[in-house]
Amino acid sequence: MTGASAPRPLYDDIGRGYARARVADPRIAAQIHAALGDARRVVNVGAGAGSYEPLLRTVVALDPSPLMLAQRAPDAAPAVVGIAEALPFPDGAFDAALASLTLHHWNDLAAGIAELRRVAPRIVVFTFDVGTYPWIATEYLPEMVDQVDFHFPPIDEVAAMLDATVEVVPVPNDCTDGFTGAYWGRPEAYLDPDVRAGMSGMQTLDQQLIESRMDRLAADLASGAWDERHGHLRDRDELDVGLCLLVTR
């Protein structure tokens, strides 16, 4: 399908150095790749720098941001610039469509899902449940919660649109992928601007606001207030911070 246009991609503005902060976690990757089943031909929609892209399969990657695609590894799958709402592929071109942490950036969720259905019989979506937020959002950045809730529907509605099951994706305490909820047991990491650079939810908020809230987090860590509330998290192996897989039936 053709004829759709899109504004300047978000990640053309916030994606510099993204690949350094966002290294796919192997445990999360294993769950995603298992959900793909025996699919051999896979389109990775919203692929960015290539996180969670399956190996040993024929993959085509698509992303609206040339800046993000430029950060892909030299041996990564071939990639094209495009948007989810108008995939430049024929009907049934793939065995499966994968979309990882990208749905909340789409301009038209229903159109994007229709396109996934058009090009592949099996769909695997790695996303998050807006009903479950990590403490960094609820306690320090409620503006992030408001922003996501405004743009993204509840997970049961998205699952119904896909006719998909929902699988919880637990996040390890030592998760290598620096998304917003990854440091639930390592709060000091949020104080590092280089770590925050890989978190789209933070990069789309006013940076003076972010700095002031991180100053408050630093003060809570120094005083012991954070550990009084959440210190038990430091010893946990994994936690449900709202991430999930949607897998078509």
PLM region descriptions:
Residues 1-43, 51, 66-71, 122-156, 177-179, 191:
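Conserved class I S-adenosyl-L-methionine
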Residues 110-123:
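A short glycine-rich, Lys/Arg-flanked "PGG" loop and its adjoining helix->strand segment in the class I
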Residues 101-105, 127:
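Short catalytic micro-motifs in class I SAM-dependent methyltransferases
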Residues 39, 94-95:
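Local beta-strand N-terminus motif with an aromatic residue
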Residues 166-249:
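Conserved Class I S-adenosyl-L-methionine
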Residues 41-87:
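Class I SAM-dependent methyltransferase SAM/SAH-binding core
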Residues 98:
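A conserved beta-strand element that flanks and buttresses the S-adenosyl-L-methionine
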